[in-house]
Amino acid sequence: QNSGWFAWEPKLHRLTAFGTHPSTNPWGVTFDDWGQHVASYPIFASAHHALDPPYPEQHPRPSGLQAYSGVCGQEFIDFPNWPKELQGMMVKVRYKSTNRVELLRWKEYEYGYQEEYVSDIIFSTNLSFIPVDLRYGPGGAMYVCDWYNPVKGHAQYSLRDERRDRKSGRIWRIMPKEAKPVNPPKITGASLPQLLNLLKRPEYRYRYWAKREIREMKPITVKTALDEWVKNLDPNDPRHRHHQVEAMW
């Protein structure tokens, strides 16, 4: 078996394959605080750093991992309206054979990372609940995409199975109890200096959205402003190195 990911560069119309490994359907793509690509084995049900071994090498097949459910997506907790003790943890959706939204601890070791199950956020005995992706919204709530279908799988059931629901679908909004939405910064229509300063934000999604806006600007204008922004960074800032990494991205 041979599977992996594709990186699409819209302006160049270039598609690059990377991160191959001996498994199937490598779902669950996100990025950690330092921009490292994190994905999940759907069969072995564990997240890992999806690096890019030189062709034809692959990631080794996982061993000793708890293979109990397929995975569709994950997101790291980094919004301030979520409890302090949850910061840096991972929320993950599993779509079969369990139907749940989980909270996991992302633990770093000398030579890699490992996830540790903490608890369920949502668990349903209704098998029509099929969470397939999740993302933070600008107000700090987490949104889960629920396929909501009594039949799942293209191999297990006929494509013409009458029970297939082609119309329904739900979006779940998750917010910690008593938490209030955060005031999102202006991104669309913001000036270049404002967008660059958003790269200092601890919330990954704000940085991601800001970089999307910056990519639409003229490269020479961005480079001039970015060079000045990097030059004025405070080396005593605990996040100084992180800001430099954001500038490279």
Task: Locate the predicted segments by residue.
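Beta-propeller blade termini and top-face loops
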Residues: 1-181, 185-197, 204, 211-249
